[in-house]
């Protein structure tokens, strides 16, 4: 069976001018996945990573101990790479410039949600790590600037996630399809288990927090009712499945077919998920697997960011389902 390391080397060989920089970054992320996997598997045995840290992130959300552990693990792994010029995280207010000679001469910046769904960790529900990689736009040889991180998602060079569930999987794209690798803890390696993943064009699963129904826009309410109606021709009603972890919900829907929705609401008028740390990387993966990602009106990957922690409504998954939901939004608002 092909390992992630072998796969990365093979793909690099397809580009004669490649210098292995992106491969090196992916290797560091592979190491991060192993470290976080190890500590998540001990979550019930120690209090060091379970519970709240007593601090809040820039969005005013309570940070879990494991949020900070995952954030620091990712940050330290990337600082050691000569290919990375800077780093931005959902857990940190400002971006971090790796202002060393190596960092100033590096070509790439990384954005990450270090631990998606971390509030689920103490009840043993799957969580994940999301990452996004861009080529910097500021001059090589200088420290990175905010502009390096404020690029639309269509300029990503790679994106992916790690899901820590019944098994740990690393799923990523470099713009040439989506591949998934399952961690074998007995060997300490990720093995290619899901090659060239394709999202079914349609599905029977919709994933949304229906407890917030009264706060949703009319278009979302109408779409939920559409999903619940009985219609044999379109195989409705659909099944509602919502874990509360973007990575876990999207991973299931990508393999089985479905739509994930985190819309705007009266308490989150701009949506709750972050464009740069969650929306863009998941949208890149969805499109590379044949799916679609929208804010209800436009393509996620075409949105020009205006803030580092900008929020966005997210409709993500099977192409036909996202198109239908978008039709409801455009009709009913």
UniProtKB/Swiss-Prot annotation:
The keyword DNA-binding does not apply. Its cofactor is Mg(2+). Pathway: Carbohydrate biosynthesis; gluconeogenesis. Binds 2 magnesium ions per subunit. The keyword Metal-binding applies. Substrate binds at residues 116-119, 209, 242, 272. Gene3D superfamilies: 3.40.190.80, Fructose-1,6-Bisphosphatase, subunit A, domain 1. It holds the Pfam family FBPase_C. Mg(2+) 1 binds at residues 90, 113, 115. Its EC number is 3.1.3.11. Signal peptide: none annotated. Its main location: cytoplasm. One of its GO terms (molecular function) is fructose 1,6-bisphosphate 1-phosphatase activity. Mg(2+) 2 binds at residues 113, 116, 278. Keywords: Carbohydrate metabolism, Cytoplasm, Hydrolase, Magnesium, Metal-binding. NCBIfam families: PRK09293.1-1. Belongs to the FBPase class 1 family. This is Fructose-1,6-bisphosphatase class 1. It comes from Pasteurella multocida (strain Pm70).
């Amino acid at each position: 069976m092909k390992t992630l390391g072998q796969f990365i080397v093979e793909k690099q060989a397809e580009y004669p001018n490649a210098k292995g920089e992106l491969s090196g970054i992916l290797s560091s992320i592979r190491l991060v996945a192993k470290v976080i996997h190890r500590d998540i598997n001990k979550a019930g045995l120690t209090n060091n990573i379970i519970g709240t840290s007593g601090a809040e992130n820039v969005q005013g959300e309570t940070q879990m101990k494991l949020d900070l552990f995952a954030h620091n693990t990712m940050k330290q792994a990337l600082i050691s790479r000569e290919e990375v010029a800077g780093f931005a995280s959902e857990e940190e207010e400002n971006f971090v410039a790796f202002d060393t000679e190596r960092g100033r001469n590096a070509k790439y910046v990384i954005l990450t949600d270090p631990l998606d769904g971390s509030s689920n960790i103490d009840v043993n529900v799957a969580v994940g790590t999301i990452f996004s990689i861009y080529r910097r736009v500021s001059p090589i040889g200088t420290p990175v600037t905010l502009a390096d991180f404020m690029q639309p998602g269509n300029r990503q060079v790679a994106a992916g996630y790690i899901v820590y569930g019944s098994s740990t999987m690393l799923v990523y794209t470099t713009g040439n399809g989506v591949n998934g690798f399952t961690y074998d803890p007995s060997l300490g390696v990720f093995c290619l288990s899901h090659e060239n993943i394709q999202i079914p064009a349609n599905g029977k699963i919709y994933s949304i927090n229906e407890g917030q129904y009264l706060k949703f826009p009319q278009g979302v309410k109408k779409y939920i009712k559409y999903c619940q109606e009985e219609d044999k021709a379109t195989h409705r009603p659909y099944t509602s499945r919502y874990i509360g972890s973007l990575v876990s919900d999207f991973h299931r829907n990508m393999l089985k077919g479905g739509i994930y929705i985190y819309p705007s609401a009266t308490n989150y008028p701009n949506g709750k998920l972050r464009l740069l740390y969650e929306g863009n990387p998941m949208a890149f993966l969805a499109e590379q697997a044949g799916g679609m990602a929208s804010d209800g009106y436009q393509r996620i990957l075409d949105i020009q960011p205006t803030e580092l922690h900008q929020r966005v409504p997210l409709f993500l998954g099977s192409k036909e389902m996202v198109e239908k939901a978008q039709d409801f939004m455009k009709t009913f608002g």
